[in-house]
Amino acid sequence: MENPSPTRTTNLQRIRSLYRLQEDKNNLNIPEPINGKVQEIDTKESLENVDRYGNYRSDFNVNNLGFYKVSKDPTLDKPNPAKRLGNKLIGHDDMLKYVDESIFMVVPGESHDRNEISAKELSRIQKWKSMCSIHLVSGNQLHSFRKTRKLILRTFKGIPDCWRSIAWWSFLVDSLPDKKLIDKYYQLNEQICDYDVQIDLDVPRTAATHFLFRKRYIGGQRLLFRVLHAVALYIPRVGYVQGMASIAATLLIYYPEEQAFIMMVNLLENRGMGDLFSSGFDTLLKAFDMLKHELSFTQSGRHLAEIGAEPSAFATRWYLTVFHQCVPFHTQLRIWDLLFLLGGSKGQTVRLLQATSLAVIQGMWDTLIDADFEVVMQALSGVIPIQNDNALLARIQLFWEKMPSENSSKSKRN
């Protein structure tokens, strides 16, 4: 990285000073930023308008749900009835029962906005508790899960939100927070980073629907800047790329800044995400070629190719943010459950992103199949209002276990 000019150095120092403010609710003395604009703080906003995940309900709605067609999906290659019965008898068919359902079907009795816990979720919480082992390490509790078939199946069904931070940490790190890495985090935040100007631009527009990130230069925005600043310095081969802000913001919803930094480092270095962000985006472009190849085995994918809708045109944000603000937050979390458990640096993360992309596109087949380029891009580029997470996850499971190109029954390919 080239040494910044004196003027740029002054700007970098100015940005750092803004995010190093001490948070005092009684005296929010926010200096004037470089561009002369300060995001207003709406003191009238109430936590009553926040859903169970911390997002303001008014910021996302499904008024455009009518744009998407809701019907059953006859196009997937599903296991034959005999195999499904055998799987059901041994408890391996829980998700496949949803595979015919539309991902846009509103599920009766299920609301992602409500804060109360249903009896079904209470049962699932107890099941996750029974799978968790607790060890005392240096006087601290360490939670861990054995990677069994049961764990994988229950993760496809969704981790209860009260277990999410524990499970994600166990899947990805599985150790106590590294004190040396935490010390390094604070050291890095004392240094100047040439990416700070771009990070500062991206911070206020990342996760803006979440109450944690609503106030400029303080709260979650301050933590987000600090984590991204430290990661860019800690992994110079990656530096900072725009999609990283979405990943860090999601982690900060569940973890303190030090742990979010550790999780971010592990995702980039041990789960293959760093390769997607690396200079030149060679790995990302290869991943798009792989997705295009798999899409060629599906009816909806062939239609996308015919109208010139390339994966790079609609899937870049899907891959680099792991579907953050591409699907509803509750759906994103279900995808992330799989990322932490099944992702890996030897192609597993790319395969999971590929399986998820195929599942989303296949779930929209009747919306896409007769649409022109403009309509297709409109459908794929915004926030896709998925309502039936289980229907999407059932499709992801099918594609994760067997990609279209791996299906030996060529005559059944749609």
UniProtKB/Swiss-Prot annotation:
> Which GO biological process entries does UniProt record here?
vesicle-mediated transport
- Listed SMART domains: TBC
Q: Where is the Rab-GAP TBC domain?
A: 158-343
Identify one Gene Ontology CC term for this UniProt entry: cytosol
Which Gene3D superfamilies does the annotation name? putative rabgap domain of human tbc1 domain family member 14 like domains (1.10.8.270), Ypt/Rab-GAP domain of gyp1p, domain 3 (1.10.472.80)
Localization terms from the record: Cytoplasm; Nucleus
Task: Answer yes or no on keyword Nucleus.
Answer: yes
Alphabetic keyword roster: Cytoplasm, Nucleus
Q: Which PANTHER family match?
A: GTPASE ACTIVATING PROTEIN AND CENTROSOME-ASSOCIATED, ISOFORM B (PTHR47219:SF9), RAB GTPASE-ACTIVATING PROTEIN 1-LIKE (PTHR47219)
Q: What is this protein called?
A: TBC domain-containing protein C1778.09
Organism placement in taxonomy: Eukaryota, Fungi, Dikarya, Ascomycota, Taphrinomycotina
